[in-house]
């Protein structure tokens, strides 16, 4: 029974409200952005979930909750910016014995690393480790690995790149003479080109583990 769930780096709650359909108990979404949290709570109210799902502004690196009070910590697409090994070790104290973490993190799927890709992700603020390395970090932190699997490429192409392309069109119309916007978009397209060429070697990986 999942009595208490944290969704860290929840954004506006896209995945949180999917979780709420499948998991009983309370879910607290935490995000640094107050604007995201406002949207999150408005969505919860619209769905009639405000008594069970609530968003709070805060940092996944500084949780203001009791130790061993959480059944599941969920984090999609946010852990890599602050450090996989660092965060899973920190979060463990807040999980009940036998509690779970479920996180996604961009990872190498092979030991055959590409320097150009590594450099891009380091510049972006989050270097890539191999999936095997991250599983090892979970075990070192005191978890049992339950499942590890790569998300399909469509999660990048259809759910990330395509919506971003649409947003880029709006930016260009709003700021037609902005060098900063053009540089930003060029960086986006470079990221896409790397994934198109090397996407068989790296991708987002889902890690599910249980606290010992």
Regions found by a protein language model. Name each.
Residues 64-72:
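A short acidic, Gly/Pro-enriched loop at the edge of an enzyme's catalytic core
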């Amino acid at each position: 029974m999942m009595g208490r769930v944290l969704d860290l780096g929840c954004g506006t709650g896209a995945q949180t409200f999917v979780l709420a359909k499948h998991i009983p108990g309370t879910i607290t979404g935490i995000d640094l952005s107050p604007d995201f949290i406002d949207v999150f709570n408005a969505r919860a109210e619209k769905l009639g979930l405000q008594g069970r799902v609530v968003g709070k502004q805060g940092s996944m690196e500084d949780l203001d909750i009791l130790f061993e009070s959480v059944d599941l910590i969920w984090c999609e697409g946010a852990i890599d910016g602050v450090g996989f090994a660092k965060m899973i070790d920190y979060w463990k104290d807040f999980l009940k014995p036998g509690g779970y973490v479920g996180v996604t993190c961009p990872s190498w799927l092979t030991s055959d690393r590409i320097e150009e890709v590594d450099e891009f992700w380091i510049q972006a603020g989050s270097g890539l480790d191999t999936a095997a390395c991250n599983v090892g970090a979970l075990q070192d932190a005191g978890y049992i690995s339950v499942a590890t699997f790569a998300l399909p490429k469509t999660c990048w192409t259809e759910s990330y790149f395509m919506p971003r392309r649409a947003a880029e069109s709006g930016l260009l119309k709003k700021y037609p003479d902005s060098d900063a916007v053009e540089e930003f978009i060029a960086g986006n397209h470079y990221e896409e080109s790397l994934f198109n060429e090397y996407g068989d070697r790296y991708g987002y990986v889902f890690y599910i583990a249980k606290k010992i």
